[in-house]
């Protein structure tokens, strides 16, 4: 904890500098700079407040010990002892909170995401489950006051999806949904099953941070752009003009199709935005040394083929295999009540990081 405390002293000094800068008229008049400083100040606020409370508690304990050692009034001594007993209960919890707040932040945690859900093993039932997962994430996003927009999809005749891609925007979306990467298994009796037998199917979920233009630069020569007539909803206009856009990143073979915007230019811009995220994600995933180190003590590997969760409908049960968590409220989970699972995953990851930090400091 001593090393952490030494870091915190510097952090408090920097936090106070940021507050002074935010009151500087020159900074106030520079909107971009003010927003950057304001965000950094907000990011540090909680850990600084916790540390100040920790120091206050430590000082109060020391003051009370002095009273206990030097005071002759028995009532004052007893009061000081009682106060210290209460404060000393707070200290370990404060230390843990500070350690967690000081853990290295995932630089992508504040980002919006692109999520792809694919029906995998199980045919029609897998595609139906992909649709169920889509609705589950849509309802969860609604509970978080996030916005969901459709990118593209391949619906199936039975009402599911062979593949569906959505964008979710809001506050710290990636920080909560990054743990959804992997294979999701469902056990249930399909509507087409006449014998009442339970079938097992899977759908895969891929979660990618939405990267801004500054994060990655793609050579225009590496992109092939095809335009074609849009299909589906949109009225007569959408079928009369070649407004749909398909972009192919030649070095990786990644393809993005976009047709939900009204103009070709809008579809181009959105397709490029999504293509950049997918290309960046592709190259990041190739860097195994970096990922292995990053995920050494993380939850699973984040591999999209790794089975992470089972949804058992007959028993109304959900099991997350990475942390051994089982909850018997599948109906509520599928209705978007994912907080219990996601909070447990975040806590597990933080605990593993703290253990690694303790090993390094040992």
Curated annotation (Swiss-Prot):
- Domain of life of the organism in this record? Bacteria
Location, primary (coarse class): cytoplasm
Its cellular-component GO annotations read: cytoplasm
Stored SUPFAM superfamilies: Release factor
Q: Is Cytoplasm among this UniProt entry's keywords? A: yes
At which residues is N5-methylglutamine found? 236
Keywords linked to the UniProt accession: Cytoplasm, Methylation, Protein biosynthesis
| Matching PROSITE patterns | RF_PROK_I
PTM (free text): Methylated by PrmC. Methylation increases the termination efficiency of RF1.
Q: Write out the GO MF terms.
A: translation release factor activity, codon specific
Location in the cell: Cytoplasm
Concerning Pfam families, the annotation shows: PCRF (PF03462), RF-1 (PF00472)
InterPro entries listed in its UniProt record: PCRF, Pep_chain_release_fac_I, Pep_chain_release_fac_I_sf, Prokaryotic/Mito_RF, RF-1
Stated family: Belongs to the prokaryotic/mitochondrial release factor family.
Function field: Peptide chain release factor 1 directs the termination of translation in response to the peptide chain termination codons UAG and UAA.
Protein name per UniProt: Peptide chain release factor 1
Q: Which organism is it from?
A: Lactobacillus helveticus (strain DPC 4571)
